[in-house]
Each structure stands twice: as C-alpha cells, then as structure tokens.
C-alpha cells in the first residue's frame, strides 16, 4: 500500500486498543478460573483471537458480543483434550504461555503456527518444562514449532534461573508451576513485565515476588473476575513518537496502561528531551492520559535493565532516534533477533532505505541523527511493528512515495491503526 508522506500537524485524541499482554492473559486466567469472567476493552487483534480460539478448542465456552467477552471458566482440571491441532497463528505469546498451561494436563496436544512463528525457537520454554516432567518436542535442536506435547498431572516443581529476560518464558513456567506438586522458584535475569504475577493476585491466587525471585505453590485455584483492559502502551508508542517528530503536532492518548514494568519508553522520551505530560493517573488501574507535542530531541544511550521494559517499543524508538540530534546507542537487546523478525536487522534495513544512518550491532544498533527521510519500498516481512514504524516514518518522507508491502501484518495488534492515523491527519 502507498503510505501518506510529508505530513504536518497531527492533532487529536486517541484511545488506543486494549493491551495485548493483558488481553491474552485475561482469556487464560478466565478459562482457568471457576465461574464466569467478564473482560472489557479486550484487544481484538489476530494474536489475541488465536488465544481465544485455542481455549475454545480446549473446551472453554467464550462469548464475545463485540463489546464484552464472557469466559465460562473450567479450572485447570476442566480443560479437555483438543480434537484437532491447536493453531497459534503468528502469536509467540500464545504458544509459549499455553505450553505452560498444557504442561499440567494429561492429554496430548500439537501446537502450530504460521511461517513466521515456525521459525521462532521454543527451546527456552521446552527445556525447563522437560525438567518438570513434560514430554515436549519440536523441530531441530531449537524446538521450532510445531510442538507436540503431553503434560503430566504429577508435574514436578522447578527451581530455575532464566537464561534470558523474557516475560513469555517466565509466564509459561508460572502456569506450569501453578499445577506442580510443591513450591517452584523462578529467578529472572532482569525484571520483565509482570502482568501474569498481577493477575494471579487479581484472580485470588498466591505468588511471592522479591526482586528477581518468584515463588509459586502448586495446586492453586482461581475465582472468576471482572477485568477491564487498559490501552496498550506498545500501540500508544507509535503515536507518542509521531507526536514528537511530526512538525506542529499535539496528540492526546487516553487510558494508556502505565504498568511500571512497561514504561521504559516514557523514560527514553524524557531522556531525549521530549515534551510529554501525564494526567488522569489511576494508580489502581495503572493507566493515564499521555500528551505529547513536537519536540527538539537529543540522542541517548539505552541498555541494561530498561531493555525488558521497552523491548517491543525499540523499533519505533529507533525511528525516534533518527530525528534526534547526535548519536543514540541501543545495547543489550539481542532478544530483538528472535521476535517476529530479526528486528535489529529489519529495522536498520527499513529505515536506512529511507535515508537513516543506522549501524546494526550484535545486541542493538547505533543511530546517527538527525537525518532527513525519503521514499522507499519497505516489506513488513509479516511483522506488525515494522509496518507501523514504517507508516510513522513515511509521515516525514520529503520526496517520493513510501510503499509498504504486507501491510496486513498490522492487524496482529492494531486493526484500526490506519483509521486512527487518518483521524490525526484531519484533526
């Protein structure tokens, strides 16, 4: 598709779609709780719909009237063996978290996904699950999907040090540990997003978190809840950056989730000198209204413990850095290589084709700013975040057309992205 270029004056208010991480987990916890869980403002992107369909295939009744989702929970012991293979689509979250759920079930299941998911290594989940007594195998020594598995009702607890900072791996092990016979201890490499831990408490379960150490007792039961999903800061990130770099812009984002394990991008914007204010802060819902305006930005260094708190925002942060004066260095982000694409290389290639000066490194990138951008042809390679990053970059392109191939990937997390962009352009 042809993207809008050379745009000025983005103005308006946006309510970004529901948080993807919380949407996935609300379906999982609702299915594993006893009673009827209701979920408002759920994200209806393709990844979350994959999770919803998988739990239907596992015997859970889920109603969705387009406004409210009702989940008739069956508890851990009420899941049924699926009649067919379980389709995870493009969703790494689905396959990893659900493998943890299935670890404590005594039936066989096979999980598969699309071409992109089939290239993503699952060994970081399968290795600890095997230690707990799960039979699980994929393709090659990295356990690429499809994954065939048979869980166990006599799951052994685990004491495990995570070799990578990954909320998905941590959450898979937590779901398994909840079904194990005794106490499990999981130690994180760096603190990652904690939605799973928060929701265990919300659904009436017990979990102890002290710094990077997590303790979970097996054999727990959950009680149905009413869940309202805040807006996704990872989706809001595209508008935060657009508002900062497109001339004469002011964008107001309502009901954005500001869970402390996800707000790294706000710290980066402050470090770069961005004009940004938070209002209507709700400490219980962990949400706020965020306003950004066009700003003079300066380069910064991004690395260490902040990386897990902005891992999904790094593609759009790279674009932000191309419009900042001076050098920005991103390091400790090797996890980007095993996302939907190798996001280090793909981000550099896409933005460099538009005139940026980005050098990919083993664990991040070096970005020289400020650089003018121009037209190019960019392929998302099926990665939703590359698609949205390119659409925002195109707004700055001074000459020639920006053509985006495989733009449908954006529906993974933000089905109404282009409608919202249109609204801001006419705001």
Swiss-Prot record:
Record-listed E.C. numbers: 2.5.1.19
GO MF, one annotated term: 3-phosphoshikimate 1-carboxyvinyltransferase activity
GO BP field: amino acid biosynthetic process; aromatic amino acid family biosynthetic process; chorismate biosynthetic process
GO CC annotation: cytoplasm
Class of the enzyme per the UniProt entry, highest EC level: transferase
Domain of life: Bacteria
Residues given in the record as 3-phosphoshikimate binding sites: 20-21, 25, 166, 168, 312, 339
InterPro entries: Enolpyruvate_Tfrase_dom (IPR001986), Enolpyruvate_Tfrase_sf (IPR036968), EPSP_synthase (IPR006264), EPSP_synthase_CS (IPR023193), RNA3'P_cycl/enolpyr_Trfase_a/b (IPR013792)
Assembly information from the UniProt record: Monomer.
Protein name: 3-phosphoshikimate 1-carboxyvinyltransferase
Species of origin: Streptococcus sanguinis (strain SK36)
């Amino acid at each position: 598709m042809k993207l809008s270029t050379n745009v000025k004056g983005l103005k308006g208010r946006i309510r970004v779609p529901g948080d993807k991480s919380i949407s996935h987990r609300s379906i999982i916890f609702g299915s594993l709780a006893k009673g009827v869980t209701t979920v408002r403002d759920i994200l209806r992107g393709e990844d979350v719909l994959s999770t919803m369909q998988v739990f239907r295939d596992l015997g859970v009744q889920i109603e969705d009237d387009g406004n409210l989702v009702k989940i008739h929970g069956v508890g851990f012991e009420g899941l049924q063996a699926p009649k067919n293979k379980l389709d995870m689509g493009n969703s790494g979250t689905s396959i990893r978290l659900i493998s943890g759920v299935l670890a404590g079930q005594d039936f066989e299941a096979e999980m598969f996904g699309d071409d992109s998911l089939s290239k993503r290594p699952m060994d970081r989940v399968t290795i600890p699950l095997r230690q707990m007594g799960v039979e699980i195998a994929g393709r090659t020594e990295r356990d690429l999907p499809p994954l065939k598995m048979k869980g166990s009702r006599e799951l052994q607890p685990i004491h495990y040090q995570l070799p990578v900072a990954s909320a998905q791996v941590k959450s898979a092990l937590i779901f398994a540990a909840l079904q194990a016979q005794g106490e499990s201890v999981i130690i994180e490499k760096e603190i990652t997003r904690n939605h799973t831990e928060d929701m265990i408490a919300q659904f009436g379960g017990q979990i102890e978190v002290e710094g990077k150490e997590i303790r979970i007792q097996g054999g727990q039961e959950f009680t149905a809840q009413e869940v309202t999903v805040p807006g996704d800061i990872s989706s809001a990130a595209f508008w935060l950056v657009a508002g900062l770099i497109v001339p004469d812009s002011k964008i107001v984002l309502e009901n954005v989730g500001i869970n402390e394990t996800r707000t790294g991008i706000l710290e980066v914007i402050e470090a770069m000198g961005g004009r940004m204010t938070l209002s209507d802060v709700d400490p219980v819902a962990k949400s706020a209204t965020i306003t950004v305006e066009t700003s003079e930005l300066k380069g910064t260094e991004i690395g260490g413990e902040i990386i897990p708190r902005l891992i999904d925002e790094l593609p759009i942060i790279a674009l932000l850095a191309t419009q900042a004066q001076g050098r920005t260095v991103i390091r400790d982000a090797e996890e980007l290589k095993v996302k939907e694409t190798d996001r280090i290389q793909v981000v550099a290639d896409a933005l460099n084709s538009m005139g940026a000066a980005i050098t990919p490194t083993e664990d991040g990138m070096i970005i020289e700013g400020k650089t003018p951008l121009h037209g190019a042809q960019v392929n998302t390679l099926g990665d939703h975040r590359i698609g949205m990053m390119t659409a925002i970059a195109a707004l700055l392109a001074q000459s020639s057309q920006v053509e985006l191939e495989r733009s449908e990937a954006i529906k993974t997390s933000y089905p109404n992205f282009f409608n919202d962009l249109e609204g801001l352009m006419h705001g």
